Regions:
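Canonical Radical SAM [4Fe-4S] cluster-binding loop centered on the CxxxCxxC motif
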Residues: 1-13
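Short acidic, glycine/proline-enriched helix-loop-strand junctions
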Residues: 128, 168-200
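Conserved AdoMet/S-adenosylmethionine-binding subsite of the radical SAM
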Residues: 40-175
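Short amphipathic alpha-helical segments at helix-loop
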Residues: 2-3, 33, 96-99
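Class I S-adenosyl-L-methionine
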Residues: 19, 53, 151, 181-188
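Short Fe-S-cluster ligation motifs
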Residues: 13-36, 195
Length: 203
């Protein structure tokens, strides 16, 4: 694991693959940059987004956990994307450690401050996601704390999610419908439909 930015794959190699894909199909609505890990760790992220946008008129989106938004360079590079989907799964350092398990010296306060700065400078479409985990950040007090943080952010949509794929920890469970409903009503978010029958899976 690392929180140091580096070039994992050359921009020209990724673009070459994308050009090949475009030859075979144009049936897509959006180009999403997700990476095998956290995409903002890629030192050539901004260069990649600009290169992708030059090849298609479809929007280019970046999905990020937001851990590196405290870095001004990362914020600047993300501004090239048409859409950015950052996550906000915690409201303090303790909850952040339980859910996101930040690597190294990443501090929640710095991460949130970076997110706040980015949401106010970004001119594209920003969709925020909160991952609610049973018994960790889904109680009434937690939801109210999220509500206070959201007042400081500028975003277009808020999605509320809960683990539906096998998580790293076996005791991580989906939140109840009652808790999710309360979160939706309190935060004004959109609940991502849960499909669960005792196990974690998604469509």
């Amino acid at each position: 694991m690392t929180n140091k930015r580096q070039e994992f794959y050359k921009t020209e190699d990724i673009i070459a693959e994308f050009k090949q894909y475009l030859k075979d199909s144009d049936k897509f609505d959006i180009v999403t940059v997700v990476g095998e890990g956290e995409p903002t760790l890629a030192a050539n992220l901004g260069e990649l987004v600009v290169a992708l946008k030059a090849l298609t008129d479809k929007p280019v989106a970046v999905i990020t956990n937001g851990a590196l938004l405290s870095d001004p360079q990362v914020r600047e590079e993300l501004c090239h994307a048409d859409m950015v989907l950052p996550s906000l799964d915690a409201y303090n350092q303790e909850i952040s450690k339980k859910i996101d398990r930040p690597y190294g010296t990443i501090k929640f306060e710095e991460e949130f401050e970076g997110l706040k700065k980015f949401t106010h400078m970004y001119e594209g479409e920003l969709w925020l996601e909160i991952m609610l985990v049973d018994g960790i950040n889904d109680d009434e007090q937690s939801i109210l704390k999220f509500q206070e943080l959201l007042k400081e952010l500028k975003y277009d949509r808020l999605y509320l999610n809960t683990p539906v794929r096998p998580p790293a920890e076996a005791d991580v469970n989906v939140v109840s419908e009652e808790r999710m409903r309360y979160a939706v009503e309190t935060l004004g978010g959109i609940s991502i439909e849960m499909m669960s029958s005792g196990a974690f899976f998604s469509e």
